[in-house]
């Protein structure tokens, strides 16, 4: 990162002031809006058992049993923090995440510097440090902050690797580092592996454009070894312990042998498009009752289907778990809905899920009602959520403009395909959560920085013409 270090030295006061502001914002979230709940306890339980018993597992009725529902990246981070600061010292974890995320913003700037120029890098750094959406997740002991850090580094070294190959220069070292950071990102969240096909696409373009194909082939080999090689011990462990082939983590956070309500998951996938339904329905199963009044109209196609669905939900509310017979009924309803309108299931619903993950107000960690559009119920919270959504839209539109006005070359193929691949994959999930798109923000903020430079150039040109 010699170019970035040189830029920081030339503009040390700017970077110092922005860094202080960014760290202050993150510490504000840590101490004002800490969010220690949900998956935090799962990660924490695994970390403690790993430390205390040497078992990567969960506590079940007082005993520790091995698990594969989470990859070892974030539990390993928590275990290290617990070993230094004490068990379940989540405040120390969140402060560490605030420091890590503040530093990660420099990598955002480095990506912008490689894609465009120094002014774009400075603008991207300012936008990144003051971005409340990534900053707020430092106040949650979840994998997002470290996942963003790993993906940012993988993007940076991948962009540098692409540029080196474009100039027919050896790039094995750069692609090796990119692969290691990609592996680290996968260990935080398995969907971060989507960066690898984006890298592969860029390498494929270079392979067919450049005469020196040996450099490209060697880069592909190094990338494959460094990104997938670290997964081998985890895969072997899962085979030895569970006798299953699982190089990542189970899709539905279930261990081998546990009952999985596939029919229920299929049913919600035929209508669920927004985060509020995830909170009110998806996360309730199993253990909490479902309020049928909170189901949207799109969850039903016919009156008989409506009555059958409510009857199944009523039975679930009596026992608060889904048994195989009930799951089969959900599957039958889902199958009929899919047959009734296959295009809705394949095209329209995935599109709406993607739109919700990108555009809804990112207030899920704040004390703001999820049903933000119900102004009559909570007017102040709704106006705040609307402002938050506007700020999110501002970042996205700025990134879109930055992409359109910049000449990114094959590096652009890499970063844009990463966003498109991630969006396409996540649209196939039945539970759209806004946090799933945060790993795209290194690209969003880097391109947004380029947009501001173009605006500044236009203002200067207009001023010169006026004078």
Q: Which residue stretches match the model-derived regions?
A:
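Transmembrane-helix signature of polytopic, membrane-embedded enzymes
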Residues: 8, 12, 92, 103-130, ...
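Short helix- or helix-capping micro-motifs
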Residues: 22-25, 124-132, 153-156, 182-186
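Extracytosolic helix-loop segments that constitute the early lumenal/periplasmic catalytic or substrate-binding loops
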Residues: 41-66, 73-76, 80
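Membrane-proximal stem/loop segments at transmembrane-domain junctions that anchor or position
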Residues: 247-363
């Amino acid at each position: 990162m010699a170019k970035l270090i040189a830029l920081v030295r030339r503009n040390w006061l700017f970077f110092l002031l922005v860094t202080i502001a960014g760290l202050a914002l993150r510490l504000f979230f840590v101490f004002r809006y800490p969010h220690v709940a949900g998956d935090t306890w799962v990660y924490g339980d695994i970390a403690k058992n790993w430390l205390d018993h040497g078992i990567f597992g969960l506590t079940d009725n007082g005993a520790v049993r091995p698990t594969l529902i989470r990859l070892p990246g974030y539990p390993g981070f928590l275990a290290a923090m617990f070993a230094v600061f004490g068990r379940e010292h989540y405040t120390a974890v969140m402060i560490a995440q605030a420091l890590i995320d503040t530093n990660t913003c420099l990598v955002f700037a480095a990506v912008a510097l490689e894609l465009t120029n120094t002014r774009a890098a400075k603008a991207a750094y300012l936008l990144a440090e003051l971005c409340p959406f990534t900053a707020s997740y430092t106040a949650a002991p979840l994998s997002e902050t470290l996942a963003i850090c790993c993906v940012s580094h993988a993007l940076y070294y991948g962009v540098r690797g692409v540029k080196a190959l474009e100039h027919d220069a050896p790039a094995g070292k750069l692609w090796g580092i990119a692969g290691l950071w990609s592996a680290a990102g996968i260990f935080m969240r398995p969907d971060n592996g989507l960066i690898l096909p984006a890298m592969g696409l860029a390498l494929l373009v270079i392979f067919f454009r450049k005469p020196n194909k040996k450099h490209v082939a060697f880069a592909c080999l190094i990338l494959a070894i460094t990104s997938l090689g670290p997964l081998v011990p985890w895969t072997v462990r899962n085979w030895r312990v569970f006798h299953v082939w699982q190089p990542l983590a189970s899709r539905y956070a279930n261990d081998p042998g546990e009952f999985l309500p596939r029919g229920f998951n299929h049913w919600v996938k035929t209508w669920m498009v927004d985060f509020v339904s995830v909170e009110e329905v998806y996360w309730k199963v199993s253990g909490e009752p479902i309020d049928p009044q909170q189901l949207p109209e799109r969850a039903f196609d016919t009156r008989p289907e409506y009555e059958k669905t409510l009857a199944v939900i009523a039975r679930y509310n009596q026992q608060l778990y889904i048994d195989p017979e009930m799951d089969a009924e959900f599957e039958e309803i889902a199958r009929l809905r899919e047959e009734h309108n296959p295009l809705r299931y394949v095209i329209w619903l995935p599109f709406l899920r993607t739109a919700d993950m990108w555009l809804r107000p990112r207030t899920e960690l704040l004390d703001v009602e999820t049903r933000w559009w119900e102004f009559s119920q909570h007017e102040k919270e709704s106006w705040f959520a609307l402002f938050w959504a506007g700020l999110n839209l501002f970042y996205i539109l700025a990134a879109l403009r930055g992409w359109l006005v910049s000449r990114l070359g094959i590096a652009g193929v890499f970063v844009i395909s990463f966003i498109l691949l991630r969006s396409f994959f996540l649209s196939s999930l039945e539970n759209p959560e806004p946090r799933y798109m945060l790993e795209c923000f290194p690209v969003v903020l880097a391109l947004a920085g380029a947009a501001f430079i173009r605006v500044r150039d236009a203002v200067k040109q207009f001023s010169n013409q006026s004078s």
